[in-house]
Amino acid sequence: MPRYKLTIEYDGAPFCGWQLQPTLPSVQGALEAAALATCGEAVRVHGAGRTDAGVHALGQVAHVDIPKPFRADKLRDALNAHVRPHPIAVLSAELVADDFEARFSAIRRHYRYRIVNRRSNLALELGKVWRVPKPLDTDAMHRAAQVLIGKHDFTTFRDTECQAASPAKTLDVLDVVRNGDAVDIITNARSYLHSQVRSMVGSLVWVGEGRWTADDLAAALAARRRSACGPVAPPDGLYLVQVDY
């Protein structure tokens, strides 16, 4: 069967996450229903990143085997028609080789965590960012973030229910950038542990608020103990931006 690579954007708020759940709305489930309506057969849509409940995507990638050939733009348009009214958009569809795997062929995943650093409530971006009212020292956050760059045992920063065989991951980039009230935490790596990005973000916010220093963050990493982690940032501000192959 022809295999297609899909690039997908979605608002994660209404979903239990990417992964199919029998009784809860999921991004994967909505796309598989759209694919069924498109080609008349049940198919599995495989995602590059299994985003958690409430996490958004600007450039999630998936692959799907369709029983009959489609022109790529026609497949994109059909999936978009059938996925409505869910807040999901198939940005592109591309015919790929049979051995392409959205998850296992990926060499890098890019995430951005968006914070609005102000006391005033959110009006336009509610559910899309994390509002942190206390002033953040973003220079201190960025300096501390460099402690986490490289290959480490990230046990402290992974969910206790994480099923990864090893807690070792290699973090290539972790930058903290301010533009007015907007604070972006930008990271990329080949892969991440469950809740790793949100755990790192919450701990960096403690640094920004002055509760922790860079040394405290380093000690938390070295502890290799989940209880040593700072707070886990809410899912609202997290975006899967891009997947590289």
From Swiss-Prot:
Gene Ontology biological process: tRNA pseudouridine synthesis
Matching InterPro entries: PsdUridine_synth_cat_dom_sf, PsdUridine_synth_TruA, PsdUridine_synth_TruA_a/b_dom, PsdUridine_synth_TruA_C, TruA/RsuA/RluB/E/F_N
E.C. numbers: 5.4.99.12
GO molecular function annotation: RNA binding; tRNA pseudouridine(38-40) synthase activity
Keyword tRNA processing: yes
Active-site annotation: D52 (nucleophile)
Family recorded in the similarity comment: Belongs to the tRNA pseudouridine synthase TruA family.
Protein name stated in the entry: tRNA pseudouridine synthase A
Organism: Rhodopseudomonas palustris (strain HaA2)
